[in-house]
Amino acid sequence: MPTSAKNPDNVKHENAVFHVHGVTKIYQMGEVQVRALRGIDLDLYKGELVVMLGASGSGKSTLLNILGGLDSPTEGRVQYAGGDLTRASEKELTAYRRYHVGFVFQFYNLIPSLTALENIAVVTEISKTPMQPEEALKLVDLGDRLHHFPAQLSGGEQQRVAIARAIAKNPDVLLCDEPTGALDSKTGIVVLEALQRVNQELGTTTAVITHNASIAQMADRVIHLADGRISQVDVNETKLDPSQLSW
């Protein structure tokens, strides 16, 4: 092989937003060790929408927290955009979470005394290159709910405000932990449509973790987790629109 040629695997790693290699996570519970992750190898690529699918206890939330800089692996390496998160200082991790990652959780965590617009502004005021709060809310189809308080919004609308809050700082990556877990299927589909719109229109690399296998059909790739390991990776050659999903 000529010295100028590149190994295809190395090229793939170079194009990855995240490169995860040999990641293990062990929690010490008294005298008992709990292995949440066991030797995870994974690349995530710019602009793709990935669903991480697994039952409760499969390790998917732990993996998402490590990708988001909320937790660190016991062993292994996590690289983001070429930088090593596993060697980052707490100050560097804080900057990473603040400027590069948007989080969406199962529960919305909106500030009850602030309107939808004001909940978004809390984030944009501390961001480097934020969207206008109105623009973020319009992107999730809530342009007519700008001045409503959380108590005046349905569960699905509150979750869409949470998505708007996450994307308003213009993150490179959107990490979603069971974003439809507290919603009925009809409302959940509206939330998934908002996530799809963000992924397609902004090009935000998006990872959604869920136990709901139906959601996997809208993803570019599906990462199956079981017992702390990646058991299977599927590529959807033909993706379904969220409106075509049912559960």
Model-derived regions: residue spans:
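ABC-family P-loop ATPase nucleotide-binding domain
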Residues: 1-26, 232-247
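ABC family nucleotide-binding domain
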Residues: 16-225, 230
